[in-house]
Amino acid sequence: MGTNTIRAFIILYLLAVCGCVEYDVDNNVQICTCANVSHINHTFWYYNNKVIALATEDRTSGYISSFIKRVNISLTCLNISSLRYEDSGSYKGVSHLKDGVIVTTTMNISVKANIIDLTGRVCYLTRNYCEVKIRCEIKSFALNGSITPLHMILGTLDRWKYLPFPTDDYRYVGELKRYISGNPYPIESLALEISATFNRFTIVKNNDDEFSCYLFSQNYSFHKMLNARHICESEWEALNNNNDNSSSMPVSHNNRANDLSSMMSQLQNDNDDNNDYSAPMNINNLIMIVLITMLSIIIIIIVVIAIIAMYKRSKYSHIDDN
């Protein structure tokens, strides 16, 4: 009874989920179970609830491709070297012991990296007018220990937005699709947005097309540029292509109609030609039939006359004999 209680306590302890542990890019991480390797029959390793490997006493199989060169997996441990930002997630090892007990250990890993996105999307478009929303968002940022004051700027030389850190403003919540007030850190999901409008036939040459996103502190700086007008020009070109395709459809239809009309005319001409050839043939046949009929009638008449003549001759001969 005491042994079972201790075993249950150990299992509950091992099932406890570790908190999120933060690492920097290129760090190494090790996740291990506390079970004795001699007691383990096999272990399944999971990444975001998907099996990435099966470890047995003899071998390990099932590595996912992105881990092949950077991971070492055994019955008891999962070691990842040279961490990448995309390695962030939940890791879990499920060990099946030889006595039937299942031991689980988990760890949530967050890999910090300096990833800032600068994107633009068209909000409104006509043949001559285009409105673009430019967005600069911090996807991830490596704090690297102590924080020096950070600053974020988005805009053009003449028009820009400024965001100092820490701040309670401009916290973007994806689920709510809006900005809310909140704690200054972590700075992930913090973003600045600015809108710009362009006229297709009016080109301004004072760098109003170029939008820049700056993120800088005492020991770090980031700069990325985006030409918003190029986005509009691509959309205008696509709009023109669609219109050209639409306008060409009736022409193609007319061509098909003309082709069909030509085919029908050709068939009609062929029929007319056939009728022209067949007309003489029908007249000749009719003449032949008439001639044959007339000849037959003449022959019948001759035969009848001959019979009558023979009858009269026979009758007169009989009278003379009397």
Swiss-Prot record:
Per UniProt, subcellular location reads as:
Host cell membrane
Tell me which positions the record assigns to the signal sequence.
1-20
User: Listed GO cellular component terms?
Assistant: host cell plasma membrane; membrane
The record gives the membrane topology as: Single-pass membrane protein
User: What residue ranges are annotated as transmembrane?
Assistant: 287-307
What switches on expression, per the entry, is described as:
Expressed in the early phase of the viral replicative cycle.
Cystines in this chain: none
Q: Which residues are glycosylated?
A: N36, N41, N72, N79, N108, N144, N219, N245
Keyword list, A-Z: Glycoprotein, Host cell membrane, Host membrane, Membrane, Signal, Transmembrane, Transmembrane helix
> At the top level of its lineage, which domain of life is listed?
Viruses
Pfam families membership: Pox_I6 (PF04595)
**What's an example GO BP annotation here?**
viral process
The Swiss-Prot or TrEMBL record describes its family as follows: Belongs to the orthopoxvirus OPG049 family.
What is this protein's function? Answer: Plays a role in the spread of virus to neighboring cells ex vivo.
Its protein name is Protein OPG049
